[in-house]
Amino acid sequence: MANQYRVTVDELIQTLSAWDGLITGRKKIHLIACGGTALTLLGYKASTADVDFLVPDKNEYARLVTFLKEAGYEQINRHRWKRPGEILLFDLFEGDAVFTTHLLASPLEPGRNRKIREFKKIYLGVLNSIDLIITKLFRGNAVDMDDCKLLVENEPINFDELKARYKETAEYETSQDKVLRNLEVFLQRIQK
C-alpha cells in the first residue's frame, strides 16, 4: 500500500528544528530541497509525500548520516531513511545527483539554490527553478510534468537558459532521446 501521509511545511520545519538541536559539530549541513519538497517549501503545494534533500557536500552528508543513525533512523534503500514507528520518509541524495540526474553545477554555487531558512547547524534551501525543472522532467511522469508547469506559472524562467542547460544535462544521460522528448512534450504543453 502506498504511503498516504503527506508532509506540510510546518511539520518539516519542526523536524529540522529538532534535528538542529541534536546535530553535533560546528559547521552547517546544507540541505537543498528538490522534488515535491521544494515546491512545498516554495508554497506552490500544500504538502509532499516524502522529503527529498540533496546534500551536496560529502562531509556534511557523512555527518548527517551519522546523526540519523544515532537518532534511530534506518536506511530503507540507497537514498531513503525512516525512523521505526514514524511515517515521515527522507530521501537523501549525496553530491550533485538528484535520483539519477547529475546537475551541471553544485547547488551550493551562487544562484543555484534559494535560502528558505537557516538554523544554527542546518541551512535549508531549495534547488533553483531551472535545475528543479530539469530533474523533474528527466523523470517525466505526469505529476512531475504538472509540477514543472506550476513552476513556470509562478517563477521567472529564462526559457533559453532552461533549454540550453537541459540539453547539456541530457548529454550525460543514458536515455538521452527519452529525456529530450520529455522536454519537447513539456514545451508543447506550455506553448513556450
Report residues per predicted region.
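Compositionally biased terminal segments of proteins
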Residues: 1-192
